[in-house]
Amino acid sequence: MLFLDVARVDYKASSSEKVGRNSRIPYRALLSVLTVAFAFRITMQPLVGKWQISILPSFDTWHSEALPYPILFALQLLILGIMILGCLRLPHLGTSQRASRVLAVTGWIYVALMVKRLIIGLFDLSDHIWFDGAVPTAFHFVLISYIMIMSHAFSEGKSKRSNFKLSRYLGYPVLITLSMALFFWMIKSGSPLTFASYLSVLIGTFGIIIHENFNSARDEWRPEVKDLIPDGMFLIIVQVGIPALLKFAIPAVIITFAGSSFVTVLDFWPHEWPLLVQVAMMLLIAEFFRYWIHRSMHEFNPLWKLHAVHHASDKLYTMNVGRFHPLDKTIQFLGDSLPFLLLGVGPEVIAAYFVFYAVNGFYQHSNADVRLGFLNWIVAGPELHRWHHSTIISEGHANYGNNLIIWDTFFGTRLLPKERTVSEVGIGNKKWPRGFLSQIVAPLTQPTEHEPDK
């Protein structure tokens, strides 16, 4: 009925009101990504029903059985068709405040239902089968995101930035909590660790990208296509491909090793402790190692040459979080992961650590307008990390924490001025190459304007 109501809305927009034509918000790109994610959900369930795929949840895990699967599948295909139509027709739609309000109200009711479902399901507060659906709930948040984006698209030119003011304060804690809660619920429901890890991170990242597009910290930090292509290559090749070849970093490999006898020789880890306590302890200890490795990257010139690849961008946004030289990434892994593998840390603990690590990392580098208040004394969030990327060397030599800021506070390197914001980010070298391969070799060919030991 919602879509029929929206379809009946009588609106005639002038060419200047066409959705997305002059907007800096990439509506179609955002909606397309969400559509692909939902299409993945629809296609994977019948595949695992026919073939056993170890990295994916079993057939029954994909739905709560509140509806017979044939009926559910037909509804999913209908929804997917509407989503595809929305992506294709978006540039030709006009603005309509009525359609926007209908979608917004529907979206918020949908949010309330799914949050209720998540809380009740995670803590076993009901025996009803509807509250067994961890995996479907994750994909319901994909649909919620689609509805909310479409709502804003229909009100383009009418919405005020102040409408998103609460996202400054709630965006970070809500998305971090949501990602972690979905992860714990999925593994509790029997989903494979790798699948639960990646899906939780993807859901959190979708939310971060939406936040930074609808309530950005700085318009000049919005990426262009020429920025996203090399960033995507860094994420795929450096963060996934190369670590896989080296048996480093990616959750799938770490989880495999964490469950093997090879890494349990030292097995001093307190496995009997509650899972959340183990994750918190791993975060605290790993941050100590990462703090000193990261600080060395800035204070020891040969290491800075490698790390400069990460700092070279003059913008901060979600997708350039993965911009690391392969050697830089390998060195960092040696400090924050290998010790825990050798100590025999359980695979669930390591997987949970990486969910927080990844979602916090995406948020940390995002262009989202964020105000964390007292949390800035605990986590290394966007407000703190932007100072770390400052072109002014005295400001950049601060806030080394990767996930937590506790060790910066202890060692006196925490920086968060109250009266101003960071001016420019980057390394000051305007000639630094932008292509993927050219950045890989840049440590050998390019100087940085501010050497860390000067």
Predicted regions and their residues:
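Core segments of transmembrane alpha-helices
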Residues: L75-I84, V174-L178, L246, L327-P339
